[in-house]
């Protein structure tokens, strides 16, 4: 079975609110809620993937030092096995705005 490495992050603002996004219609698992993040490319660290994905998806800049490891998910789907490190981030530069 193919393994897929996806990194995700819980963005927590100063008021303790956590950003979640709803998966759009037409994508697998449409309608479910998820943390921002994405696939880790070959040769890329999970932290580097999150820095890239947060810039692409939300237009914010995050330093690797601001990504704190929090948890880990491992789940077998029919076609692949998901491996997902989850981080927490409480500091970033820019205003969170959806881009995708």
Question: Where are these predicted regions, by residue range?
Answer:
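A structure-centric signal for secondary-structure junctions around beta-strands
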Residues: 1-6, 15, 29-30, 81-83, ...
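Active-site-adjacent beta-strand/loop module that shapes the phosphate/pyrophosphate-binding cleft
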Residues: 4, 13, 71-96
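Conserved amphipathic alpha-helical interaction elements at protein-protein interfaces in regulatory
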Residues: 55-60, 93
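Conserved Nudix-box catalytic region and its N-terminal flanking loop in Nudix hydrolases
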Residues: 17-56
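Conserved N-terminal beta-strand and adjoining loop/helix that marks the start
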Residues: 1-18, 39, 72
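A short coil-to-beta-strand element that immediately follows conserved catalytic motifs
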Residues: 61-71
């Amino acid at each position: 079975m193919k393994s897929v490495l996806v990194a995700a992050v819980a963005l927590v603002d100063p008021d303790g609110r956590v950003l979640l996004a709803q998966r759009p219609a037409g994508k697998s698992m449409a309608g479910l809620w998820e943390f921002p993040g994405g696939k880790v490319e070959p040769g890329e660290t999970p932290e580097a993937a999150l820095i890239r994905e947060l810039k692409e998806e939300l237009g914010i800049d995050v330093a690797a030092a601001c990504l704190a490891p929090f948890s880990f998910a491992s789940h077998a789907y029919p076609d692949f096995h998901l491996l997902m490190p989850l981080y927490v981030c409480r500091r970033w530069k820019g205003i969170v705005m959806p881009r995708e």
